[in-house]
Every structure is written in C-alpha cells, then in structure tokens.
Amino acid sequence: VTFEFSFDKMHTKYPHIYRVQSTFREGEVLTDNWASSSFGYGSAMKENLAGIEDYTRIGSLLQPEQIVKYGELTLRENQIAYADPGFFRLFDFELLKGDKKTSLSMPGQVVITERIARKYFKEEDPIGKILIFTGPYYKISCEVTGVMEEMPSNSHIHYNFLISYTSLPKFIHEYWYKHEAYTYVLLDSPEREAEIEREFPVMAEKYKTEEALKNKTWGVDLVPLADIHLTPQLGYEMETKGNRSAMIALVFAAIAILAIAWINYINLTVARSMERAREVG
C-alpha cells in the first residue's frame, strides 16, 4: 500500500507538476477523456495562460515500437519516446552521463538507459555513438548524448530511449490535431489549476483551424503528478494504473485485523488475570 501511494514523489517539484489530460464535450456531454494531449498544448498554454512556469512534452504514441540498429546489431525495441529539454527540468531522473541541459536540445539526439547502453555497447562508452531508429513512419539516426538510470518502479513514466523532440518532423512540433503526446506543466502555485482548466477552452478556439473535432469543446483536466497512478484509467494511458479504492480497502482491512487482534489480546489478558485472581482467592 505504501508503495502504491509513493508514485512519482521522487521528483522535488512534484507538488507543482500536473499532467494535462484532454477532454472533449458536445454541449454538456463528455464524449472523450484522454490521458494524452495534442503536441501543441504545452507551448500554447505557456504562451497564453498565466501561472505556467515550464512544461515538457513526451511523444510516445506516434512510434512506440521501432527497429534499432547499431553496427551489425539490429533489434526490435519498445518504450521509445520523443522528449523536449523540459523533461529533465521538470523530472529528477538521474543522468549518469551527459548534460541535462543539452542532451535533448538538438535534432538527432537520444538519451538511453544504463541497461540499453550495456545491451548495445557492452563496455564501450556510448556517448557519441550512433543509433539508427526505423519506425512505421520515419527513419532517423541519433547520436547518444546521455545515459540515465533506470526509471524507478514507482514512476508512471518508463522509457528506455528518449529521442530529442525536434527529431520529429517539423509540422508535428506544434500540431493540434494529433493527441499523441503527454504534456506536463509546472505551475507557480497549485491554486492555478482551476483557473487554467477554466480558461483553456477559450484559448483553444483560436487553434482549432481544421474540421476534425471542431464541433466539440476542447478542454483539459490538470491532474497532480502524484495522483496520476491512482486516478481512473483513461484512454491512451502510458501504463495500467493502480486502484485507489482497492488500496483504501486494504488499509481498512489491515486496521480491522489489527483491531480484532488487539481486542483478542485484551480479552485473553483479562481472562488470564481473572483466572489468576481465582487461584489466589
């Protein structure tokens, strides 16, 4: 239970980090509720809405599985994402090699986990080596610019490869009609949450330039980072979530068991005391 409630609290800024989740309504009817968001949400929110200090975008729904090649070694890999430099500004994932400020700043860069570094490069220094990624839509060559620790098991984010966001085709960078990214914002105060949710639909109107989803009201739910794991499962989640109700039920069950054990102990103690009193009497 303690483990389930510890998710994503390893990041020092977690009380101010929120995931931006997409909502779509027709009139008052909620028709869609997704964990993912548009590629363009983060930058537009930072530019137009007060209270957002920073943001990051993670694109992992576009090409989550790719062929990765290094020299003669060719493997099919998953847990591949595209991330912008804000990733290491918001999250405290440890970088063992490389510079957090620059490792995702240019096209054609990739940060890999320590396990992946051993898998492809054995004892060689991976920094500066080239990995070739071939997905359903794009093929790119990336220079390894960082090696990070494995992401903790009590994180809802788990990737083996982080490719620089600008490695994606330019038209996708701010594209509003592909909700295939995960957006996280850093707020100057948690009190901004309701204000941003209220103002987002008004802001969204000027970005809805295509017919797709134009008949719907675009909105967002801002979910605190530490709450993501135990909130209800939505469409396009990164991973299967935990169950808050089940965790609470376990806590109450544990309390009940302890209470019963305590009552039994008291009853047994009283019974023994009375028995000794009769023996003395």
What kind of feature is each model-predicted range?
Residues F3-E65, K170-I172, K178-Y184, D188, ...:
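Membrane-proximal extracellular/periplasmic loop immediately following the first transmembrane helix
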Residues T240-A253, A277:
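Membrane-interface helix-boundary signature
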Residues M247-N267:
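Alpha-helical transmembrane segments of integral membrane proteins
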Residues W262-G281:
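Intracellular coupling helices
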Residues A81-K97, G108-S245:
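Mid-to-C-terminal secondary-structure elements
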Residues F39, L49, I58-L61, K69-D99, ...:
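The feature marks short, hydrophobic/small-residue-biased sequence motifs that occur predominantly
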